Amino acid sequence: MRWLLSTDPSLIQFLLRWTLAIVIFPHGAQKALGWFGGNGFKGTLAYFNKSFPAPLGLLAIAAEFLGPIGLAIGLLTRVAAFGIACVMIVAVLTTHTKHGFFMNWYGNQKGEGFEFHLLALGIAVALILGGAGLWSVDALLAP
């Protein structure tokens, strides 16, 4: 438990934490609430259930919706980052690798590549290793 909450008072970790939270939250809100043109909870879970058991779909939605909230306040940062990292790995392996590296910037691919996911994964791993950084609930709770 000590390692889970421990962190250095790092501005870099704080910036990484907020960057990942800001970028991932809209994706989670699409899945959980139907915001930003998303399918909402039921629609997303039905889509995920075509390929994965319902509990895994539920975990993915939670990771993308609750994870960024945890990151924003620095609560259980390593757990939130791990959940997001898992979602990024699964997305790359199941969906995006076949479309190559690049995002579909020009609309001439049949799908999105995995460059975004690789960036998010790198930030998540940095948070798993380094913790929440400055201005975090984790730092307040750490023994």
Regions found by a protein language model. Give the residues of each.
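Extended, low-polarity transmembrane helix blocks
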Residues: 1-37, 46, 51-62, 66-143
